[in-house]
Amino acid sequence: MKVVIVTSVASLLDASIQFQKTACRHHCNYLSMQVVKEIEEFGTINEKKLEFDTWKDVIQNDEIDAIVFYRVKQISISTGVLYESMMRNRTKPISMYFVRDCLAFDGNPPSFRMTSCNINAYNRNKIKDLIILMNMKTCNKKIIGEFIIDNFGSVDALLSIINSNVTWVTSVINNSNGRGINIRVSNNKMLTITSFRRFVNKLKMYKTTKCASQLDNLCTKMNKMGILDKK
């Protein structure tokens, strides 16, 4: 199956694009899909954007079997409307996958169905590594901050994943702190809440320190392009 990956960001300060690509590539590899093209969009996808040459090349190519999005929210119109717009210029049906949402839009007639959330397997390994790093006294904030950006794209993206897997994350945190399974049931809920809140608060600190660095990098890039040059 030949597919096209579509990633998108809402602002220049959104650093999640690389994480989106990694997640989509991992999903494609898991399902034995062949990635033939990757599209980076700014803003949401609508019917107007389908008129651009980049999209026309994809839509009119019947060798493309599917489009892999990171999530449904990348599309500002209904998925059904987007599908109908694409099919006006195709003779062969096309499927759509949404990695983060674990959804696929396909079939005859096309409809949503759940898919294997293999992205969680990738995220879990990275989150386990992150927790280990945060418990190591030899790891400073710079190392941990770079690990978050390299593997998740941004602190916001990481927090979104963590908030979707609260139970699993807290169990890993408790185990990494050396807490065994003999904890009294009456104390378990309080330990879970405390551990999770402490972990999230630590991550939010990396968000504030990283924002300044990202802004500096953005300004540097804009200077190189001449955007900030005085006329």
From Swiss-Prot:
Q: Tell where it localizes.
A: Host nucleus, Host nucleolus
Question: Coiled-coil stretches, from where to where?
Answer: none
> Main site of residence?
host cell
**GO cellular component labels:** host cell nucleolus
Q: What induces it?
A: Expressed in the early phase of the viral replicative cycle.
Which of UniProt's keywords are assigned here? Early protein, Host nucleus
Pfam families per UniProt: Pox_F16
What superkingdom heads the lineage? Answer: Viruses
Question: Family assignment?
Answer: Belongs to the orthopoxvirus OPG058 family.
Descriptive protein name: Protein OPG061
Q: Which organism is it from?
A: Monkeypox virus
